[in-house]
Amino acid sequence: MFTLKKSLLLLFFLGTISSSLCEQERDSDDEDQGEVTEQVVKRLVRGCWTKSYPPKPCFVRG
């Protein structure tokens, strides 16, 4: 019974650490996605509105 409790405690501890690491990575990925979106929007607006009037449809190339 004592070894079962130790095993369950160890699994809980490792699961908690794994969960927190995944959450941190997910949060950092979300922040990176926001920055990429801002860059694409800035590129899109600058390319469309400054080169011609009336603006032509723009296609963003990654």
Curated annotation (Swiss-Prot):
Cell location: Secreted
Signal peptide per UniProt: 1-20
Major localization listed first in the record, in broad terms: secreted
InterPro entries membership: Frog_antimicrobial_propeptide, Frog_antimicrobial_Ranidae
Cellular component, GO, one term: extracellular region
Lineage top rank: taxon: Eukaryota
Pro-piece positions: 21-41, 62
S-S pairs: 48-58
Annotated keywords: Amphibian defense peptide, Antibiotic, Antimicrobial, Cleavage on pair of basic residues, Cytolysis, Disulfide bond, Fungicide, Hemolysis, Inflammatory response, Mast cell degranulation, Secreted, Signal
A Gene Ontology BP annotation from the UniProt entry: mast cell degranulation
Tissue: Expressed by the skin glands.
Function: Mast cell degranulating peptide. Antiproliferative activity against human breast and ovarian tumor cell lines in vitro. Inhibits granulopoiesis in rat in vitro. Causes histamine release from rat peritoneal mast cells in vitro. Has antibacterial activity against Gram-positive bacteria B.megaterium Bm11, S.lentus and M.luteus, and antifungal activity against C.tropicalis, C.guiller-mondii and P.nicotianae spores. Has hemolytic activity. The mature peptide inserts into the hydrophobic core of the bacterial cell membrane and increases permeability without disrupting membrane integrity.
Family membership noted in the UniProt record: Belongs to the frog skin active peptide (FSAP) family. Brevinin subfamily.
UniProt name for this protein: Peptide leucine arginine
